């Protein structure tokens, strides 16, 4: 299966509770992460992480599924239609 360029948006509502689990998963998939930007948003008491990824649909589904199972984490993603 071909890899495609895409993004993952992660919102963390309970940073102290979730950060270790989220970072462990991102480290596990580090070879497929092209860029990462993470910002705390104190006004809403959450943190936002945006990832640019180069993954297959299966890899993306597995990673986002694991992230989505962590309490206090919301995740959305998309891949390009074409193989880049």
Q: What is each of the regions a protein language model found here?
A:
Residues 1-84:
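Long, contiguous binding/interaction regions
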């Amino acid at each position: 299966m071909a890899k495609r360029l895409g993004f993952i948006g992660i919102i963390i509502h309970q940073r102290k509770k979730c950060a270790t689990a989220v970072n462990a998963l991102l480290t596990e998939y580090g070879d497929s992460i092209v860029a990462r930007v993470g910002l705390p948003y104190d006004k809403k008491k959450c943190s936002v992480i945006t990832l640019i990824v180069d993954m297959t649909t299966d890899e993306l589904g597995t990673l986002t599924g694991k992230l989505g199972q962590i309490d206090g984490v919301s995740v959305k993603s998309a891949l390009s239609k074409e193989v880049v």
